[in-house]
Amino acid sequence: MNNNQGMYNTQTTQGYGNNQGSYQNQMMYNNNNPQNTQTTTFLYASSIQPQQQQQQQQYNNQYNNQQMNSNGYNNQPMYDQSYSTQQYGSSTPSPQYSADSISCCSQVSSTCCYQTQQGYNTPSNNVQYSPSVYQYGRK
């Protein structure tokens, strides 16, 4: 699946130019694939200025969460960052997670999360781990 993403990103970046920010950032994640290393190096060399700016927007969301998570919310990067940052902002959700709820779900099993989410047990909530699930499901 990663290889297919790399192929599509290569075609898109070469076809439409380097102003496709989302595709460039996806190419970064495919950097682990040996097939895509040459293409990513080419992207670095050709558009290092705009790509750094777009990168920082994505990585700052993750790193800001990790800095806040150093206060005891270290398990939050397990969850999908795209849901927590886009829907709730990077500063709001992590203080709402209690250390008990996260340590329960991460250390015991995933079934613990489903049990505490009674009443909110839809597949979307289980995937997103939204703050509202923990706020109202735990208390």
Swiss-Prot record:
<feature type="compositionally biased region" description="Low complexity">
    <location>
        <begin position="49"/>
        <end position="98"/>
    </location>
</feature>
<feature type="region of interest" description="Disordered">
    <location>
        <begin position="1"/>
        <end position="98"/>
    </location>
</feature>
<feature type="compositionally biased region" description="Polar residues">
    <location>
        <begin position="1"/>
        <end position="12"/>
    </location>
</feature>
<protein>
    <recommendedName>
        <fullName>Intrinsically disordered protein, expressed in pharynx 15</fullName>
    </recommendedName>
</protein>
<feature type="compositionally biased region" description="Low complexity">
    <location>
        <begin position="13"/>
        <end position="41"/>
    </location>
</feature>
